[in-house]
Protein backbone atom coordinates (compact mmCIF):
# COMPACT_ATOMS: atom_id res chain seq x y z
CA UNK A 1 0.00 0.00 0.00
CA UNK A 2 1.35 3.42 -0.93
CA UNK A 3 0.82 6.20 1.56
CA UNK A 4 0.52 9.52 -0.20
CA UNK A 5 0.21 13.09 0.98
CA UNK A 6 -0.78 16.38 -0.56
CA UNK A 7 1.83 19.02 0.23
CA UNK A 8 1.51 22.76 -0.14
CA UNK A 9 4.85 24.36 -0.89
CA UNK A 10 5.49 28.08 -0.84
CA UNK A 11 8.71 29.29 -2.47
CA UNK A 12 10.14 32.78 -2.29
CA UNK A 13 11.87 34.06 -5.41
CA UNK A 14 14.09 36.92 -6.51
CA UNK A 15 14.42 38.27 -10.05
CA UNK A 16 18.05 39.01 -10.91
CA UNK A 17 19.28 40.05 -14.37
CA UNK A 18 16.17 38.63 -16.02
CA UNK A 19 16.54 35.29 -14.21
CA UNK A 20 14.29 33.98 -11.45
CA UNK A 21 16.12 32.46 -8.47
CA UNK A 22 14.60 30.66 -5.50
CA UNK A 23 15.49 32.38 -2.21
CA UNK A 24 16.82 29.90 0.38
CA UNK A 25 18.48 32.26 2.86
CA UNK A 26 16.71 34.40 5.41
CA UNK A 27 17.39 38.09 5.12
CA UNK A 28 17.68 38.18 1.33
CA UNK A 29 15.23 40.38 -0.58
CA UNK A 30 12.17 38.67 -2.04
CA UNK A 31 10.33 39.77 -5.19
CA UNK A 32 7.42 37.35 -4.88
CA UNK A 33 6.18 33.88 -4.05
CA UNK A 34 5.08 30.80 -5.95
CA UNK A 35 2.69 28.24 -4.54
CA UNK A 36 2.81 24.57 -5.47
CA UNK A 37 0.39 21.79 -4.66
CA UNK A 38 2.21 18.48 -4.72
CA UNK A 39 0.98 14.91 -4.47
CA UNK A 40 3.81 12.83 -2.94
CA UNK A 41 4.46 9.27 -1.84
CA UNK A 42 5.88 8.46 1.61
CA UNK A 43 9.48 8.99 0.38
CA UNK A 44 8.69 12.52 -0.75
CA UNK A 45 8.77 11.67 -4.46
CA UNK A 46 6.40 13.93 -6.38
CA UNK A 47 3.71 11.89 -8.11
CA UNK A 48 2.04 15.01 -9.49
CA UNK A 49 2.66 18.72 -9.07
CA UNK A 50 0.66 21.83 -9.88
CA UNK A 51 1.89 25.40 -9.97
CA UNK A 52 -0.81 27.72 -8.71
CA UNK A 53 -0.80 30.63 -11.10
CA UNK A 54 -3.12 33.58 -11.52
CA UNK A 55 -2.87 36.67 -13.76
CA UNK A 56 -2.93 38.91 -10.68
CA UNK A 57 0.14 37.85 -8.67
CA UNK A 58 -0.42 40.42 -5.92
CA UNK A 59 -2.72 38.11 -3.93
CA UNK A 60 -0.08 35.36 -3.90
CA UNK A 61 2.66 37.78 -2.85
CA UNK A 62 0.45 39.11 -0.04
CA UNK A 63 -0.40 35.55 1.02
CA UNK A 64 3.29 34.60 1.03
CA UNK A 65 4.24 37.64 3.09
CA UNK A 66 1.40 36.91 5.53
CA UNK A 67 2.56 33.31 6.03
CA UNK A 68 6.25 34.15 6.24
CA UNK A 69 5.76 36.94 8.78
CA UNK A 70 2.89 35.49 10.82
CA UNK A 71 4.42 32.09 11.39
CA UNK A 72 8.11 33.02 11.16
CA UNK A 73 8.66 30.45 8.41
CA UNK A 74 12.39 30.00 7.79
CA UNK A 75 13.35 29.92 4.14
CA UNK A 76 15.00 26.51 4.23
CA UNK A 77 14.29 23.27 2.43
CA UNK A 78 12.68 20.87 4.90
CA UNK A 79 11.57 18.29 2.35
CA UNK A 80 12.15 14.66 3.34
CA UNK A 81 15.17 14.19 1.06
CA UNK A 82 17.06 17.07 2.72
CA UNK A 83 16.08 16.03 6.25
CA UNK A 84 17.67 12.62 5.66
CA UNK A 85 21.00 14.19 4.64
Regions picked out by a protein language model, each given a short descriptive name:
Residues 42-61:
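A short, exposed loop/beta-hairpin motif centered on an aromatic-Gly-Thr core
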Amino acid sequence: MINAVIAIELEAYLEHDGQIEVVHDQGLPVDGYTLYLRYENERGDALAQWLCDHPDHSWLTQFGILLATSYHIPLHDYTPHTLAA
